[in-house]
Every structure is written in structure tokens, then in C-alpha cells.
Amino acid sequence: MAKTRLYLVRHGKTMFNTIGRAQGWSDTPLTAEGERGIRELGIGLRESGLPFIKAFSSDSGRTIQTMGIILEELGLTSQIPYRYDKRIREWCFGSFDGAYGGELFHGVIPRVLKTDNYKELSWPDLANGLVEVDTAGWAEPWDKLSGRILEGFEAIAREVESSGGGNALVVSHSMTIGTLAHLVDENITKNPNVDNGSVTVLEYENG
């Protein structure tokens, strides 16, 4: 059986990314710059010669758009199985979804949680802090958030493994990929910088 590898791609740069708004469950399309970056990624993956047997993304428009571009550049549109999984969506920022990120991450969160830098917070503290400041009641507490992210990626990995293993493309989101990295390796305690169009490779084995 081939090794099971997930190639985790953060979606391309969007309108909200460009103007600095918090983009969780809210959604905006890729900009022209974002599309170009993902096309370059697709070309790079094609030139690498890596074979991909399945594709997955969250159900957000920006990840679906990103995957469409990558598959087009790989010549795999409609050629390999592709499905959405809402469990690998971005974090929900509740009443701050769509607000300016600076207001949330450099203003409200540091003030409420009494820290100078939100990136120094642990993942659980940041998640539970969002719940505390969310007036809409939509943000997910850490246990629920981490549970659905781990469940989603494990289901994807098991699906690939049960097909005999191989490489799968997975398009997701910055904080979701960072959360998964922490859940896989607890030494990754802080928010890593996951750039638009970056690739993180995760190897899965033994169920």
C-alpha cells in the first residue's frame, strides 16, 4: 500500500484578505492576484510530477475556487473524486466575522484576555476568548472546534488510506491548518504563519 499523504493548501488570497477583514465563515472570492498565485501553485505541482488520487476542500467558496484552479492546471478537472467537507472550514469569528482583523486580534482579544500579542496565546485560550467576546453566540469553544477539525481531516485521511493510499489535495484555511498542526504535534503551541497558497504535507499511517 502506498503511503497516505495529504497536501494541505491554504486558499488563494481573497478580497477580505487584501483589506484586512476577519474571514471565518464569511466568504469573499479570490482576487486577480490570488488567482495568479494559485495558478502558479498548480503549475508547480504539475511540474513536480506528483500523482493525486483524490481532492477535498471545505465548503467555503474561496476553497472551492482555489481547488478548481489547481485541478485545471493539473489537468484533473472531473478526473479524480472531489468532495467538500464542512468540518474543515475556517474558525468562526462570530459577531466579528467580516470585521476588521486588527479590531479583533489587536484590540478586543488582547484587551479581554490581557495580553499584548494574540499570537502568544495558546490555541484553546484564543478559541475560548473568541467565544467570550462573540455577542452572536456563533463562535465555537475549543473542544467543539478542535473536535470537528480533527474529525474532518481524519475522515479524509482514512478515506484515502482505505483506497490504497496515495496523495490527496486538501484545500482549507489558515487557522484550521494551524489547529491541525497543533493537534498532531502539541509542541506547535502558537499560531503559525500559513500563507495563502502555501502547502503543508501531512503523512498518515496505521489508521
Where are these regions (language model features)?
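Generic structural signal for well-ordered alpha-helical scaffold segments
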Residues: R39-R46, L71, S146, L150-E161
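Active-site catalytic pocket residues across diverse enzymes, especially alpha/beta-hydrolases
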Residues: I70-L74, V160, V184-I188
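Active-site-proximal alpha-helix that buttresses catalytic centers in soluble enzyme cores
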Residues: A2-S78
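Domain-level recognition of soluble alpha/beta enzyme cores
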Residues: D185-G207
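Phosphate-handling substructures
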Residues: E73-R148
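Short glycine-rich phosphate-binding loop at a beta-alpha junction
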Residues: P51-D59, P81-R83, G164-V171
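Active-site glycine-centered loops adjacent to acidic/histidine catalytic or metal-binding residues
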Residues: H11, R87, H173
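Extended, basic/helix-rich recognition subdomains
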Residues: L145, F153-E154, G165-N187
